[in-house]
């Protein structure tokens, strides 16, 4: 085997080149590491040995014929042959002739806000990581020592930045690269800022709704970005003290794809239009969703039995996109248990929403005061008078259900087991009713009577007996409750523009006399004791009604202590013309 020989002149040349490269690798600062470029074409080649502090470009540029911006970038590399290294917090003083071209190269080891200041007006263009995508940084307000055209990047990611400068006039130029935002000394930046983040889990659909309060500082110019981080045993939580760290962690998860569009990774995050829902990539642990001025976001494709940490950042549009951390929260994305209902308590529950079905649970007490077979009584009052159905479940098996009802209704559940837990599922009777079926009032009791609620009759209809020009007589079935009881008749005036009783029926309002008078469109009210009649029929005449008007009438049963319960609402339509006082209509 022959050993290859090398000429002495070639060995000296290689030794000189290696010593120059080694000297270039050593010369760097902690905040910004620079590599001396011997030739402009070296920018387009990947180095053989990567610098651990500065990541190389992760995107392979597209061919020049397919990407005009890359073609222009390569042309600028040839035209701007005068190269100068730029370091963070180290000013550069140079003298430039008119129309002289200068190229600055800045390498960042860490993501940070970046401000580049010029002492004189110059033309400038900035590129990130040799991708050929020109950045569009915001301008810095001119001031002492800061000329018009200075640049600010709210978040400069790790990597190489090429800054091409064209002098407009002859003279001295000072260039400063500062690792801070020009608004970093804003007095409110470190002020106490308490904002609540609320979440709603939909584990079956792998969805989560995130809502938050608006910013207390300059809310009219504040935009929001939500950072979602999935936590696991393999990937512990990363603490983001600023928005740049979150963007850096997000971009490190995936290589940048070649693109001819202007702007860097941060502009791609901010530039995405706000959407009502956003699908998360389950292969990534960090996600960033910017919502603009919207203060809620629907997230999809979450992983069950996982924990998520939410960081909310504000983007101040009036201060050059200054970012500040507003709030944080941690959520366990597990199946939530149904809300447990309490006995002898009238509770208002939500039954609407995108699901259309809501489930609540209740437990039969271990010991009951009943002598015979144990049972449970349910009082159900649809708030808006919409038709709903109820199903009773035990261990996922249906043990009872009701027909559609729209007024106060009692259900007697027999054959219950003491100590067992049951589920109560509400759902609208049809798709049309789903628009109005939003809330329902529920009361449970294992006794024959509700302690603080009056008993309503089986038929809760209120009848319109007779209507005259300015009066109406109504009747209803008396309560079977033997306790001391009274009735209140409450009249609301329906507005002329909309006389639909559907829009104004509300069985869940506070019918306490002192409070019901505060409601809108309240017209008249009277309360009296029950009447003694053989058929247990109660009647009342309502006076001073206006011809041509429409009224919504409620009758409530009231105990001396406790909450009143309403009968079914009645609508009165008064005739618009009345020839004499004897004119009347019967129903």
Curated annotation (Swiss-Prot):
Pfam families: NDNF, NDNF_C
InterPro entries linked to this entry: FN3_sf, NDNF, NDNF_C, NDNF_Fn(III)_1
Subcellular location as annotated: Secreted; Secreted, Extracellular space, Extracellular matrix
Annotated keywords: Extracellular matrix, Glycoprotein, Repeat, Secreted, Signal
Record flagged with keyword Protease: no
GO terms, biological process: cell proliferation involved in imaginal disc-derived wing morphogenesis; extracellular matrix organization; extracellular regulation of signal transduction; imaginal disc-derived wing vein morphogenesis; negative regulation of BMP signaling pathway; negative regulation of canonical Wnt signaling pathway; positive regulation of BMP signaling pathway
Molecular function via GO: BMP binding; carbohydrate derivative binding; glycosylation-dependent protein binding
Signal peptide start and end residues: 1-24
GO cellular component term of the entry, any: extracellular matrix
Residues with glycosylation annotation: 109, 129, 190, 321, 334, 459, 498, 558
Subunit description: Binds heparin. Interacts with dally; the interaction promotes dally degradation. Interacts with dpp and gbb.
Record function comment: Secretory protein that acts as a feedback regulator of dpp/BMP, wg and hh signaling pathways. In the developing wing, is a dosage-dependent modulator of dpp/BMP signaling involved in wing growth and crossvein patterning; low levels promote and high levels inhibit dpp/BMP signaling. In the early pupal wing, inhibits dpp/BMP signaling activity to prevent the formation of ectopic crossveins in the posterior compartment. Binds to dpp and gbb to modulate their release and activity decreasing dpp/BMP signaling in the responding cells.
Protein's name according to its UniProt entry: Protein NDNF
Organism for this UniProt entry: Drosophila melanogaster (Fruit fly)
